[in-house]
């Protein structure tokens, strides 16, 4: 990575701390507010400079589409974190949730996987996501209806197919024995933790 100016280092450090604390990068508006920029456009210019210096990657079309390339390089050496039991109110990628790391190339999944989540139950078995599988997940909140997502409803984390209907979200199982989960956004909290991008079934070789 090329040397950063003091201001660029501030932006870089803010992005890194937000990912560590919240599990996701900040928006342009959040960067501008925290660092005293006049507008989100000013933050965008600093992000472009960081991208030119290969410190970060900007993912088009996503409000939080920022990936730290140095972190990616470290993660590729360490492997993908396997997330176990997620504590209520804690970011899914908080260190205490990581059971271990698997030596898997994140780039084998498209988009690139950021973590693995062990599947519990058979609610998604009809599309080949089985109990005990390791689900590869791309960390993002930018998802479309019909995609399989990792969602947190209040304090419960689940893997389901997403459907939005006004102020209601339906999380569909892929098993006729399971009814959809109805989430009333006016009274319940829903957050999207990521997009399912693949599975690993036979882990004996890892």
UniProtKB/Swiss-Prot annotation:
Domain of life the protein comes from: Bacteria
GO biological process: DNA repair; DNA replication; negative regulation of DNA-templated transcription; proteolysis; SOS response
Keywords linked to the UniProt accession: Autocatalytic cleavage, DNA damage, DNA repair, DNA replication, DNA-binding, Hydrolase, Repressor, SOS response, Transcription, Transcription regulation
Site (Cleavage): 88-89
EC number of this enzyme: 3.4.21.88
Classification via CDD domains: S24_LexA-like
Keyword presence, Membrane: no
Transmembrane segments: none
GO MF term list: DNA binding; serine-type endopeptidase activity
A family per Pfam: Peptidase_S24
Residues of the active site: 123 (for autocatalytic cleavage activity), 160 (for autocatalytic cleavage activity)
Annotated catalysed reactions: Hydrolysis of Ala-|-Gly bond in repressor LexA
DNA-binding region, residue range(s): 28-48
Similarity comment: family membership: Belongs to the peptidase S24 family.
Assembly and interaction partners: Homodimer.
Xref: HAMAP family: LexA
Function summary: Represses a number of genes involved in the response to DNA damage (SOS response), including recA and lexA. In the presence of single-stranded DNA, RecA interacts with LexA causing an autocatalytic cleavage which disrupts the DNA-binding part of LexA, leading to derepression of the SOS regulon and eventually DNA repair.
Protein name in the entry: LexA repressor
Name of the gene: lexA
